[in-house]
Amino acid sequence: MHLERDKVYDAPEGEVWSTVKPASTHNSAAPKRLAQRWNHRWSDESLTQGVSPLKDSSKTVKASTTIPLGTGRPTALYYPWQSVSMAGTEASRQPRGLKPTLAGNMTCSKGEAAFDLSSALNYGEPSGWSQLVAFFRETTGRVHRPPYADWDTTLTCGSTSAVDLVLRMFCNRGDCVLAERFTYPGTLMASRAQGLRTVGIAMDADGLVPEALDAALRGWDAASRGRKPFVLYTIPSGHNPTGVTQSAARKRAVYQVAERHDLLIVEDDPYFFLRLGRGGGGESLPTSYLSLDTAGRVVRVESTSKILAPGLRCGWLTASRQVVDMFGNFAEVGPSSPAGPSQAMLYKLLVESWGPEGFAGWLDYLSGEYGRRRDVMVAACERHLPREVCAWTAPTHGMFLWVGAALERHPRYQESGARDQDRDADADAELCRAVEDGICARAEANGVLVARGSWCRVGGGADRAFFRMTFVATAEAADLERGVAQFGRAVRDEFGLG
């Protein structure tokens, strides 16, 4: 089976994604508009980026009668693998908490009609193997229902790689990128490596604050700060590191600001499917920016890392056809596509074994397991963390708990004697780092690792020390209790609470 680009995976009839609340109000009977063009926003690198002539010419080597003397692809006769076998998990829609059972073996062989191992071991298309792309395109269409006509989906080598390429596509050295006040450190590192500056936008309990975003753009001084930023990077569900999930109303307000200032929204959403509920139960999937996007100004980035396995190094990206095509040009001379064996594993599991129903069932199961672990960690925090110093909010999506420690309760802060209006911001930032270092050193000495909030902070200033704790990384849920207890002891020692 080889599906052409514009075709979709032939999913079974029935509503698989029954927990999805459609965000788009677009009349499905009315024609959808085409996405806006982004020629005015391409980076200098994009303007000089073309299609690799060697790789482009190899696409024509399809017919068995063609003698491929111009390619650099060795014949499959000399690949030492004849077949690859794997055992997967049986997943279906079932009561939450019921552990999936072991499924039968899945085999990918040379010459196989559905997914030829010879093809998986050869150079692949930058967009990924069509059968697998079709599955993710179909999933995207059913879940998000993009309300414009010319959207498309491509595979990526994971979210970090995808975001790095998107920044290269739109930004020049010296440009500024907008992001939440706290954000994923990998994106901060990628931005710095490209010579970009990240501008932090205020957050509240619903995530990114649209009024703060609008104010930052309205008051932008191009003479002193360079050209006005037009790329907004956001992690809307189970935000890394804060755990916050943006409400549908919040996303609509942010999207309106994006329309007003002609922003491109990079929606990095690896935790979208991990809905934990407020008491261990499931919730509907969040409204996505993609589902609100009527003009093709959203680049949605998703990943298999948090829902299947990080080592697959595979994700998928959805955007307008123009943006997806440019992404493919960058991928051809960069990371290319995910490794063929990874794609074969995904195809055998998602398409041949699970299908959409099984995939949805697996995500239900995973969400239930993560929700229970979240509850264990939150309960441990209630028992072991000093409330007079620490604050946290149980996340409804994702895998992180964000704990803040009030600096004004620290002995060094109180010893300074300065009133709030007289405090030195640099001194407070230094104290914040010292408190983080002290707590982390004590915790590590007792065998517990937590992530420092300063690694995720955009810009300076601090009135709290923050720590990110993951509740899905331990093999045993009981380790969460012991880990939080040791972390709580480290906080008490650092703040002199005995």
From Swiss-Prot:
The gene is swnA. Belongs to the class-I pyridoxal-phosphate-dependent aminotransferase family. The keyword Transferase applies. Aminotransferase; part of the gene cluster that mediates the biosynthesis of swainsonine (SW), a cytotoxic fungal alkaloid and a potential cancer therapy drug. Swainsonine production occurs via a multibranched pathway and is dispensable for fungal colonization of plants and infection of insect hosts. The first step of swainsonine biosynthesis is the production of the precursor pipecolic acid (PA) via conversion of L-lysine (Lys) to 1-piperideine-6-carboxylate (P6C) by the aminotransferase swnA, the latter being further reduced to PA by the reductase swnR. GO terms for biological process: aromatic amino acid family catabolic process; lysine biosynthetic process via aminoadipic acid; tyrosine biosynthetic process. One of its GO terms (molecular function) is aromatic-amino-acid transaminase activity. InterPro entries: Aminotransferase_I/II_large, Class-I_PLP-dep_aminotransf, PyrdxlP-dep_Trfase, PyrdxlP-dep_Trfase_major. This is Aminotransferase swnA. Keywords: Aminotransferase, Pyridoxal phosphate, Transferase. Its cofactor is pyridoxal 5'-phosphate.
